[in-house]
Structures are given as C-alpha cells and as structure tokens.
Amino acid sequence: DVMQLQLALSRAGYAVGGIDGIFGPKTLNALRRFQAANGLAIDGIAGMNTWTALNKYLLGYFNHRIERGDTYYKLAKRYGTDVKKIVSANPDKNPDNLIIGDTVVIPFGFDVVPTNVMFTSLLTETVIKGLKARYPFILLEMIGSSTMGTPLYALRMGNGTKKVLYNASHHANEWITTP
C-alpha cells in the first residue's frame, strides 16, 4: 500500500511530499534515498528487503542489544526518543543495571497510531503489535473474525471499574455490520 510506504518513509526521515497514496516522483526519490542509506538495492521498488527495513517505522519500535556503556538516557538521545518510553516498554529491566547482551525495546519518538493514513486490516495488526511492544501490560486477544474474514481483536488495559470498548470495525466499511 502506497500510503503505508509513504508513512514509513516519512517516519524514517525521508520527505515524500505528503501522504496521498500516489507513488509519484517525491515518493520514488525518498524510497531510493532510503534504500541507499540502508545498503539495499537502489531500484525504487518496495520489495521484501525494503519492507523489512521499513517495518520498524510502522511498528514504532525496534530491538536494541545492550552494549558496554549503554544507559537508557544515552539510548534515548541516540535514537531520538525519551527515557520514559524506553522504561515503559521494558518493565522487566532494571535501568540502573542493564546487562550486556540483553535486548531492550526502543520506541521511536512518534506516536504508533497514525492519523494521516487510511487503515487496513494489515495496518491495524501492525499498530496493535507496536502498541503491545510499547505497552507490554496491554492484554491482546482475538475475539473473532469480521464478515470479510479478517481478525477482530480486543485490547485490555488497566483494571478499574470502568470498561470502555474501542473497535476497528470501521476499516473496509465493516461498520455497516457492526452491532
């Protein structure tokens, strides 16, 4: 999907001239620059290797292996995020005692949920995976399938008395059949 490509490229720092779903010269140029910077074949085609490299920008995080001298503060500065996001994504790690070789989740500085693209079932799943990595306390369950055969998910967070349900049935015009 061109909009998702444009979203990933813009989040990676490559100007696409707006997210409009049109694979024009600005998107092509941004794609080629991304490919060159990431050691990929500079063919202007968003093939499997390019999507693999771009995927972290759709997920909103990546994994980092702890090296000597790493601190959450240094990692936040290096990757343009903040310490609070790293702490939230890694509740099982002691920030004062990082172990060399351990892997930590590094959330990017941008919001996971985009508001400037049309959602698809695949983007919904990607966003959910990104939210789950950033906020590991979220409980995720599949509660069925839509009339179009795509999974329906429920996300649970918190344990208060008030319960609120948000759903993604609006994607692909499925709101028509949502009770």
Segments (PLM) and residue ranges:
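M14 metallocarboxypeptidase catalytic domain recognition
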Residues: 58-179
